[in-house]
Amino acid sequence: MFDESKFDVNLKLWALRIPRELCKSASRILNGYMLNMPRIKPITEDPTCEKTRLVILSESVKNADLSEIPEEKLNQLKKLSELEVVPHSVTLGYSYWSADHLLKQILPDGLDIPSSFETIGHIAHLNLHDELLPFKDVIAKVIYDKNYPRIKTIVNKVGTISNEFRVPKFEVLAGENGMETEVKQYGARFKLDYGLVYWNSRLEHEHMRLSSLFKPGETVCDMFAGIGPFAIPAAQKGCFVYANDLNPDSVRYLKINAKFNKVDDLICVHNMDARKFFSHLMAVSTCEDNLQSVADNDKTKEAAVSRGGETNSSGEEIRESNASINEPLGANKKPSGTTKTENGVGKDCKSIEGHANKRLRQTLLPIAKPWEHIDHVIMNLPASALQFLDSFSNVIQKKYWKGPLPLIHCYCFIRASETTEFIIAEAETALKFHIEDPVFHKVRDVAPNKAMFCLSFRLPEACLKQEE
């Protein structure tokens, strides 16, 4: 691809041959006059004698008489040992130089050097601009060489995202072909196949920002859950999560990650269209039929569930009897230690705090009733989530609902030519009702004239389905 030797730079330097036991003292005297370059040791082995070492002098020392070094320091050195000045060469090769330095040498003048890339486990996603595509293989080789073994696969996006699952097409430019990897975020671990599911490492802080708004015992509905970057942290806080995604591969990895992070008893996984998903949660008769086996088994029984130990046998029977792609992983369990108030809304108790301590906790096994209360709804599909706000119109039945209506967290893109008022108008058009006290949070810039925002608001009571 290219000759690595062409990047070699040979430095002609001077060095002092010093007895090995005196090198430490000599280096103190020569402070400021020794070679000071990243990853190059100024004291090295002497190839001619095991009892001595070579103290490499800086490039500023040009002459063998060491005239650039103050006489006072030279006199101190002479008291330590007889001065023996020898020529020494240092070759800075391909392995020494940074990726940025090498690419500046390789790429034509005027092209922007790719200074960063997204890291997904062992995978580096370059996302090269069109003008860099003719040099994609060279760029990939340099980045691979300079980041291995932390990075084992280099990929680049091919074309635009056009499929319904928001998953780009990639080509592997260097390294292994394996696209399955593992990502860590704030105490959670996620397994995924980067070629099959959507993942954006740059949203890590947003995942935790939103999760920090949730309280233990709350119920969260994640309409575009992916592999669980919002659902898993929410469950780790002791929330009960209804998580949905249209992509079957995302759902498969969501289930894997729920179990991997030991929160599968707090996440109910669905694989369906987002509108149908929310309608399904609000359909009283359908949910009652699905959960009848739980009700018949024991409506109020408490089971002590150990994090890594045995589970109650009846709980296992419930888990098996309700297992399907549109059923909860954990047999429709409600949040750990949740108690009911007079209005039926779940409140915190100490057993939920125990969930975070990863020890023993108490888990209630009553019928889950999402049509009665949900605290938060997450809509992380910024390209089209606003259009899905019609999912909430005339679906929640007023006669069954208890407590405040949910907070909606809807992600969207706002271009430089657009205003928040324009986005509110678009949201109200889809919702068909006025939104009170909307809050915008800027997540990140995605392009020079385009930013990602989170619009949060309380669902208007006008959206409720009135009693007939």
UniProtKB/Swiss-Prot annotation:
Positions that bind S-adenosyl-L-methionine: H207, D245, L246, D273, A274, N380
Enzyme class: transferase
Main subcellular location: mitochondrion
Catalytic function, reaction form: guanosine(37) in tRNA + S-adenosyl-L-methionine = N(1)-methylguanosine(37) in tRNA + S-adenosyl-L-homocysteine + H(+)
Pfam families membership: TRM5-TYW2_MTfase, TYW2_N_2
PROSITE patterns: SAM_MT_TRM5_TYW2
Region (Disordered): 301-348
Composition bias, Polar residues: 309-325
One GO-annotated biological process of the protein: tRNA N1-guanine methylation
Keyword S-adenosyl-L-methionine included in the entry's annotation: yes
One example GO MF annotation: tRNA (guanine(37)-N1)-methyltransferase activity
Entry function: Specifically methylates the N1 position of guanosine-37 in various cytoplasmic and mitochondrial tRNAs. Methylation is not dependent on the nature of the nucleoside 5' of the target nucleoside. This is the first step in the biosynthesis of wybutosine (yW), a modified base adjacent to the anticodon of tRNAs and required for accurate decoding.
Name of the featured protein: tRNA (guanine(37)-N(1))-methyltransferase 1
Organism encoding this protein: Arabidopsis thaliana (Mouse-ear cress)
